[in-house]
Curated annotation (Swiss-Prot):
NCBIfam families: agmatinase. This is Agmatinase. One of its GO terms (molecular function) is agmatinase activity. PANTHER family: ARGINASE/AGMATINASE, GUANIDINO ACID HYDROLASE, MITOCHONDRIAL. The gene is speB. Gene3D superfamilies: Ureohydrolase domain. The keyword Manganese applies. Pathway: Amine and polyamine biosynthesis; putrescine biosynthesis via agmatine pathway; putrescine from agmatine: step 1/1. It catalyses: agmatine + H2O = urea + putrescine. Catalyzes the formation of putrescine from agmatine. Keywords: Hydrolase, Manganese, Metal-binding, Polyamine biosynthesis, Putrescine biosynthesis, Spermidine biosynthesis. It is an enzyme of class 3 (hydrolase). Mn(2+) binds at residues 112, 135, 137, 139, 216, 218. The lineage of its organism: Bacteria, Bacillati, Bacillota, Bacilli, Bacillales.
Length: 290
């Protein structure tokens, strides 16, 4: 890596030049092969990196600086275009390798289906895993028009793997009636519309447990994040989402990995969504990687 590459927009700002000593690995999952509405999230990771050079390295929320954190931006996993299953397998294998080295995986999507293989890898390492999920949508379908590999199915797959009672979804305001009924019947926690106050109630219950945090950027209202594939009105503000990340960071839960997905730059004409996403990623790195 060139000396100035950490500030070039080619990697996330302040990335270290070598991975061996890094505590966290930032990586992209540029896949949007199964989106049901507007594609383009495969370009999300690269745009988030590009705009990250506009960030300050210091977080006044957490009183911590990226200079204090040893993380490495590994770039994007070279996923085979149009091949969902092979792409998911490659993601799982890569995250397995990160976890084997004792490093924190911080992923960038890509559509939300990319979280599924990451969760599988996390669950192998941490069988007591719980998931904190921020999203506009339930993502609890069994399939989408007969296809089980869809960005509308990852949380259903995760819930069936680790147990619905170990999945906590926040900000949900869209989904099929059957999805909400399945969650209720199976003991899954869904907080409709709201995020911060319900999260505060849940976090003490997860104290000491390994947790994976997945954020779909469309949990934000389209006024705050227009650059995503499936916008849904009535969402939360970026201030509320940042406060939620900080609430997790200051809690007693043991965050072991995280991702942020569904940034689609083609619909993000002012780069508002990518800029918001890059700040959230900075806060997750500084807040979750101890």
């Amino acid at each position: 890596m060139r000396f100035d590459e950490a500030y070039s927009g080619k990697v996330f700002i302040a990335s270290r030049p070598e991975w061996e000593e890094a505590d966290a690995i930032l990586y992209g999952m540029p896949m949007d092969w199964t989106v049901s509405y507007r594609p383009g999230s495969r370009f999300g990771p690269s745009r988030i990196r590009e705009v990250s050079i506009g960030l300050e390295e210091y977080s006044p929320y957490l009183d911590r600086d990226l200079a204090d954190l040893n993380f490495f931006d590994a770039g994007d996993i070279p996923l085979p275009f149009g091949n969902p299953q092979r792409s998911l397998d490659m993601i799982e294998e890569y995250v397995d390798s990160i976890l084997e080295k004792g490093k924190f995986p911080m992923g960038m999507g890509g559509e939300h289906l990319v979280s599924w293989p990451v969760i599988k890898a996390m669950y192998k390492k941490y069988p007591d895993l719980a998931i904190i999920h921020f999203d506009a949508h339930t993502d609890l379908r069994v399939d989408y028009e007969g296809e089980p590999l869809s960005h509308s199915t990852p949380i259903r797959k995760a819930a069936e793997l680790i147990g619905p009672h170990n999945v906590y979804s926040f900000g949900i305001r869209s989904g099929m009636k059957e999805e909400f009924e399945w969650a209720k019947e199976n003991g899954m926690h869904i907080s409709k519309f709201e995020v911060l106050e319900p999260l505060k109630e849940v976090l003490p219950k997860l104290a000491g447990r390994p947790v994976y945090v997945t954020i779909d950027i469309d949990v934000l209202d389209p006024a705050h994040a227009p650059g995503t594939g499936t916008v849904d009105a009535g969402g939360i503000t970026s201030k509320e989402l940042l406060a939620s990340v900080h609430e997790i960071a200051r809690s007693e839960v043991n965050v072991k990995g995280a991702d942020l997905v569904e940034v689609a730059p083609v619909y993000d004409h002012s780069e508002q969504t990518a800029n918001t996403a890059s700040k959230i990623i900075r806060e997750m790195l500084l807040g979750f990687v101890k």
